[in-house]
């Protein structure tokens, strides 16, 4: 069994750190008691953010930060086109998919035009947790299997299903019995057949990862578990964000 990840634990603020904080920051951290324990606060000295524009953030003291972390605002904070579109739609109509509406159809068509022909349907979800949850359930229904493979530092969501597939949540989270972990495709540290992974061609690196997947599938089969899916984001963001060679996932998929 692979070692459980503690990435989230390592980055988290803990109550015993409060004594070193200024009074205002300490007060805000104490007031977070109204939030559930799954809400994590980062850093020994938590950042109190009040404004964002583009790739920059500002805290309550006016200190400016370059945001190279946040995964929420993928087109930049407060992008004027996004703000304008949200404002216009919120001022006109906010409802669900049980009624006819052109916008959802046009949006779906735009997205599908960028996808392979095999992906010809869309089911919109509100969060990544829900999207991954649905993807796994689709894979399990299609294959008739239950087994899911993830990388050793992966985070895939907070739902009942995806949290059991997220080693990055740390030791407080029980992992699924039908889940298997493979090593993170770390081009900085891995050595493959005596050669640093960073020097490997895409096919060579992909063959290594495909071998790790095959070993995980074989272990599932030894325990009577049928393989259903490999769940991964292509940059392995929770694992560390690795610049792996373009096309390396093809041998894994094949």
Residue ranges and their predicted role:
Residues 2-53, 71, 89, 205, ...:
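Active-site-adjacent loop/helix segments that line or gate small-molecule/cofactor pockets in enzymes
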Residues 242-254:
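Catalytic PLP-binding core of fold-type I/II PLP enzymes
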Residues 109-229, 246-247:
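PLP-dependent aspartate aminotransferase-fold enzymes
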Residues 74-76, 95-96, 189-192, 238-242:
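A generic structural signal for short coil/turn motifs at secondary-structure boundaries
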Residues 36-40, 68-80, 235-239:
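Glycine-rich phosphate/pyrophosphate-binding beta-alpha loops
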Residues 7, 13-16, 64-146, 157:
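Glycine-rich loop-to-alpha-helix module at the N-terminal edge of alpha/beta enzyme cores
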Residues 59-60:
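Short, acidic, Ser/Thr-enriched surface-loop or helix-capping motifs
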């Amino acid at each position: 069994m692979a070692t459980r990840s503690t990435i989230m634990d390592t980055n988290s603020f803990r109550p015993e750190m409060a004594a070193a904080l200024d009074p205002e920051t300490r007060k805000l951290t104490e007031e977070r008691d109204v939030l559930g324990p799954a809400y994590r606060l980062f850093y020994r000295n938590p950042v109190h953010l009040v404004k964002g524009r583009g790739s920059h953030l500002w805290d309550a003291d006016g200190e400016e930060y370059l945001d190279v972390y946040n995964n929420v605002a993928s087109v930049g904070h407060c992008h004027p086109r996004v703000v304008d579109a949200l404002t216009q739609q919120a001022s006109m109509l906010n409802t669900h998919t049980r009624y006819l509406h052109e916008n959802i159809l046009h949006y779906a068509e735009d997205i599908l035009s960028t996808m392979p022909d095999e992906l010809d349907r869309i089911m919109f979800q509100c969060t990544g947790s829900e999207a991954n949850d649905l993807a796994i359930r689709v894979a399990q229904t299609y294959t008739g299997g239950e087994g899911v493979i993830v990388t050793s530092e992966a985070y895939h969501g907070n739902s009942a299903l995806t949290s059991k597939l997220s080693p990055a949540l740390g030791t407080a989270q029980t992992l699924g019995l039908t889940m298997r972990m493979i090593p993170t495709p770390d081009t900085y540290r891995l050595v493959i057949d005596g050669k640093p992974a960073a020097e490997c061609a895409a096919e060579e690196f992909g063959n290594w990862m495909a071998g790790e997947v095959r070993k995980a599938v074989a272990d599932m089969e030894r325990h009577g578990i049928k393989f259903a899916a490999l769940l991964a984001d292509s940059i392995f963001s929770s694992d560390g964000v690795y610049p792996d060679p373009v096309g390396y996932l093809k041998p894994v998929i094949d």
